[in-house]
Amino acid sequence: AVDWVRGMDALLNRVGNNADLRILLFTLDESTYARELAPMAGHWPCLRIGPPWWFHDSPAGIERYFNQVVETAGYYNLAGFNDDTRAFMSIPARHDVWRRGVALHLAGQIDKGYFGRSDAEHLAQLLAVELARDAYGLIP
């Protein structure tokens, strides 16, 4: 198992407070999202949590991802969604699954009274487009 905290300790103590630097963390081990990655991203300005990949980029996986990271890391410490697939024709479908997962999550937050529709619309744009642009430095 990867020990994210000890493994990145020296690096983050040197550059972790640099808000201009972006370090994106990806994992296939779902158990580390809530236990290590979300608290780390909530603390270190340079860190962003990468999107749920491989086995987790499914409707249920995306729901688990949001449940594990948002409470501690918030939305602004996420990297949105990017795609690494070699199956070029699946890219639109994968992004559609992400956007639908975002919409379901945000609708649930509205239903619980955590925020209103206008906040959800803003967060939907962030999660669908802006956070990925920011994480990868694609914003001029």
Feature map (PLM): residue ranges:
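Small/polar glycine-rich anion-binding or flexible loop at a beta-alpha turn
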Residues: H56, D83-A87, S118-L126
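Short flexible/disordered coil segments
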Residues: E36-A41, F81-R94, K112-R117
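Histidine/acidic residue-rich metal-binding segments in metalloenzymes
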Residues: A1-R22, T32-L47, G61-G80, W98-A107
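His/Asp/Glu-enriched short active-site or ligand-binding loop at hydrolase and phosphoryl-transfer sites
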Residues: R48-P59
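Short acidic/histidine-rich active-site segments
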Residues: L24-L28, G50-P52, Y75-H95
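Short, catalytically relevant binding-site loops at active-site mouths
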Residues: D29-Y33, F55-H56
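Mid-to-C-terminal alpha-helical segments outside catalytic/metal-binding sites
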Residues: Y76, A93-P140
